[in-house]
Amino acid sequence: MAVVTMRELLESGVHFGHQTRRWNPKMKRFIFTERNGIYIIDLLQSLSYIDRAYEFVKETVAHGGSIMFVGTKKQAQEAIAEQATRVGMPYVNQRWLGGMLTNFSTVYKRLQRLKELELIDFEDVAASGLTKKELLVLSREKAKLEKTLGGIREMQKVPSAVWIVDTKKEHIAVGEARKLHIPVVAILDTNCDPDEVDYKIPGNDDAIRSVTLLTRVIADAVAEGLIARSGAATGDSKPGEKAAGEPLAEWERDLLEGDKKDETAAAAEVQTSAETEKVADAEKPAEAVAEAEAEAPAADADAEQA
């Protein structure tokens, strides 16, 4: 079954590129035609590239990796936060801080600082042992850290790969990922440079519906990878598959527990029906013996009368 259909891509406007005067010649091979001064992206190529990116993300997560979702433009902020939160992955949908990947040790210290500030009760001035002014300063510091680092609060190390919406706007993130040899999965509009991206998806990175659809596809790949990872951890996987390296998201645990309950109920039902059949089979010979014994005296009485 296809990850996404051609109809969904068309309805979301994934095929619309930029104006013909705003393009990168390296994207020529992904362009189908031009209409009214707008480039039209070849969706047949997009479909094959989506499948390739989907498999990469799924395998990366299944082997214990993590995917960072990055998109700070207004059209992408909501979709990035929603889909990354759904699958329990880190995300950046506000300003990208320089060094977020290449200088992660310093960023990690700021994350620890954020967690310290979250322990303070800003409503109870007396119990905090601080003045109102000091609490106000700390409250502002906490709000600033939450805005810039809230999406990566639980991140313990640099991600295994990054999903990026608009590589031109997020050129700093792309540069840091390439410097650390972290694979980049991204939407490529007609004004982007395909050489910067490892797993490219030719498409529209400006329309909200297009960005939402493609980000959801990547999140679905993450979800499938998490399920495969949990199967490896419980020993249900095929030989050669890697075990889980990171905890599952809460929604994944609920899903798996529900599946296990269904399997247990089905097994119990099969066992009960098998036991019922055995009892029935055991009762049949006993009934036959009883009938034979009842018929024997009747036959003897008939013989005596004769």
From Swiss-Prot:
Q: Pull one GO CC term from this UniProt entry.
A: cytosolic small ribosomal subunit
Which residue windows does the record flag with biased composition (Low complexity)? 287-300
Recorded GO MF terms: structural constituent of ribosome
The biological process GO terms on file are: translation
Q: Which SUPFAM superfamilies match?
A: Ribosomal protein S2
Q: Per the record, a Pfam family?
A: Ribosomal_S2
> Where does this protein have compositionally biased stretches of type Basic and acidic residues?
275-286
Q: Where is this region: Disordered?
A: 257-306
Q: Which UniProt keywords apply?
A: Ribonucleoprotein, Ribosomal protein
**Record carries keyword Secreted:** no
For this protein, the parts annotated as crossing the membrane are none
What InterPro entries does this protein's entry cite? Ribosomal_uS2 (IPR001865), Ribosomal_uS2_bac/mit/plastid (IPR005706), Ribosomal_uS2_CS (IPR018130), Ribosomal_uS2_flav_dom_sf (IPR023591)
NCBIfam families (alphabetical): rpsB_bact (TIGR01011)
Family the entry assigns: Belongs to the universal ribosomal protein uS2 family.
User: What HAMAP family does this protein's entry cite?
Assistant: Ribosomal_uS2_B (MF_00291_B)
What's the protein here called?
Small ribosomal subunit protein uS2
Origin species, per record, is Streptomyces griseus subsp. griseus (strain JCM 4626 / CBS 651.72 / NBRC 13350 / KCC S-0626 / ISP 5235)
Q: What is the lineage of its organism?
A: Bacteria, Bacillati, Actinomycetota, Actinomycetes, Kitasatosporales
